[in-house]
Amino acid sequence: RVFSVPRLYNYVEYLLKLSAPTGEQESRPFRCGYLPGRVVAYNHPDDRTHFSSASFLGSPSLVRLPDGGLLAGMDHFSPDGSLDTSEFYRSDDEGNSWRFCSRVSPAFWGKLFLHKGRLFYLCVAGSYEPLVIYESKDSGRTWTGPVRLLDKIPGKPGGPHRAPGPLAVCAGRVWAAVEYGSWATGGHEAGAMSFPEDGDPMDPAQWTCTGFTPYDPTWPGTSVGDNEKYLEGNMVAAPDGRLIDFLRYQCRKATPSHG
C-alpha cells in the first residue's frame, strides 16, 4: 500500500514507525531534501535495518526490459558493511516512479545486462570475492544463481573486482572488464572475461579469461607518484574493430593528479 504524509520539510530528520497487531514494531529513519531527477531508492545513513552496517547505495545499473519496463540495480556498502547485497527496482512509467522488485545475495559491484532477450546480473560475491552471474526469467522478480565464473587465484593476493561498466560485443564474443587485486594488496591488474556471442552466459565452461596485466608506471604518459593505479574498466568495441578497455585512472596525490 502507498501512504501520503503531508507537511514534511526538507533537511529535517524523521522516524517512521510501523506497528503490527502482534505488537512487533519497526522504526526506519529518513529525511527529505532536493535531488535532481527521480529518486529510485533511498537509504538513510543511520538505517541498518536490513543490511548489517552497510548504509550507502552504489554500483548503479539500468536496463530496459523486453516488456518495456525499466529495471535499476544497486548494491549496499559502507566501510564496515557486509558488502554482499544488491537490490532491484522497477519502473513502468519511463522512470517517473519506482517500486521495489527483488533482492539478491551474495552480489556486489554488479551490472545488469540483456543477452538475446535474457536478463542477467554479473557481479562478485562480495568485496574481492569470486565473480558470479545470476539470471532472471521473470523480469527481475526472482533470480537463479549464483553461478561461479572466476574464483580467487591460489597464491595471488586480492581477488576479482569489477564495476558496473558496459559489456561489448567484438569478434563474435561478449566481453566484460574485470580486474584482480585489491587496494590493500597494492592495486589492481586489468583483464577481461568473455563468452561466445551465441553462447549461454550461465554456463561457466563457455567463459574465458584473458589473464591480468599489472599497472606499469614506466608506460608513456603516466602520472608520477606513489598512488597511481587503474581499475573499474569499461569494454568498448571501437569502430576500427579493436576492443578497448577504458579504465578509471587513480592518480590522486600524483603529478599530474588529474586528466
Q: What residue spans do the PLM features occupy?
A:
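Beta-rich carbohydrate-recognition and catalytic domains
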Residues: 6-8, 12, 17-108, 113-163, ...
